[in-house]
Curated annotation (Swiss-Prot):
Main location as per UniProt: membrane
Protein keywords: Cell membrane, Membrane, Transmembrane, Transmembrane helix
InterPro entries: Homoserine/Threonine_efflux, LeuE-type
NCBIfam families referenced in this protein's UniProt entry, alphabetically: 2A76 (TIGR00949)
Residue spans crossing the bilayer: 42-62, 66-86, 126-146, 147-167, 189-209
Membrane topology: Multi-pass membrane protein
Source organism (scientific name): Haemophilus influenzae (strain ATCC 51907 / DSM 11121 / KW20 / Rd)
Molecular function via GO: amino acid transmembrane transporter activity
Keyword hit for Cytoplasm: no
Stated name of the protein: Uncharacterized membrane protein HI_1307
Family: Belongs to the Rht family.
Length: 210
């Protein structure tokens, strides 16, 4: 049962989306501390959705259909806003000595964790994933120890996956490539965020209306 959970969740994580683009961009352009904080935020978001799924997220959406639409509308709006800011970026990243220290001084751990959390919570793809695919996996988990273990598996696997992604994109070759093409990478990532956001807003409005 837990093996099925690990496999299903791994494939869910491997599907490219806002979380992946956020972590890879942070790893290539920001400090290690800030990137890990972002990963912690995303992991907290996954933990939140995982807990809701175990408490009957799918049943809640069936009982209150408009709730799903509201979540998609709010999440889509935030993603679209992030996408707009990134899509209009005209600056190239510059990596200098002590850049990690400078990055760390420009923000706080709390702010970076919150950024990662908001990126995940605003991603309605995660909502659909946990309310449909993951619910089918978790439906047979009824014992308290199984619930605790399943929750731990989801949280640990999420953090480990994105930490590995951050290690890959924080390598010097990745930083050089990002520095050289950062404007275009940010613009493309922004377009992806904007697309996700607009689709979610559109679908959210449709669900609320109907």
């Amino acid at each position: 049962m837990m093996l099925n959970l690990i496999i299903v969740h791994l494939f869910g994580l491997m599907t490219p989306g806002p979380d992946f683009f956020y972590v890879s961009r942070m790893a290539a352009s920001n400090s290690r501390r800030n990137t890990v904080c972002g990963i912690l935020g995303i992991t907290l978001g996954i933990a939140f959705w995982g807990m809701l799924s175990m408490l009957g997220l799918a049943v809640l959406f069936v009982t209150i259909p408009a709730l799903h639409g509201v979540i998609m509308l709010l999440g889509g709006s935030y993603l679209a806003y992030l996408g707009f800011l990134m899509a209009r970026s005209k600056k190239y990243a510059k990596f200098e000595s002590h850049s990690d220290t400078e990055f760390n001084q420009q923000t706080t751990i709390k702010k970076e964790i919150l950024k990662g959390l908001l990126v995940n919570l605003s991603n309605a793809k995660v909502v659909v994933y946990f309310s449909s695919v993951m619910s089918l996996v978790l439906v047979n988990i009824t014992e308290m120890w199984q619930i605790i273990l399943a929750f731990a598996v989801i949280v640990v696997e999420t953090f480990c996956y994105f930490y590995v992604i951050s290690l890959i994109f924080s390598r010097n070759i990745a930083k050089r490539l990002y520095s050289q093409y950062s404007r275009y990478i940010d613009n493309m990532a922004g377009i992806v965020f904007l697309f996700f956001g607009c689709v979610l807003v559109y679908n959210g409005i449709n669900e609320i209306i109907h």
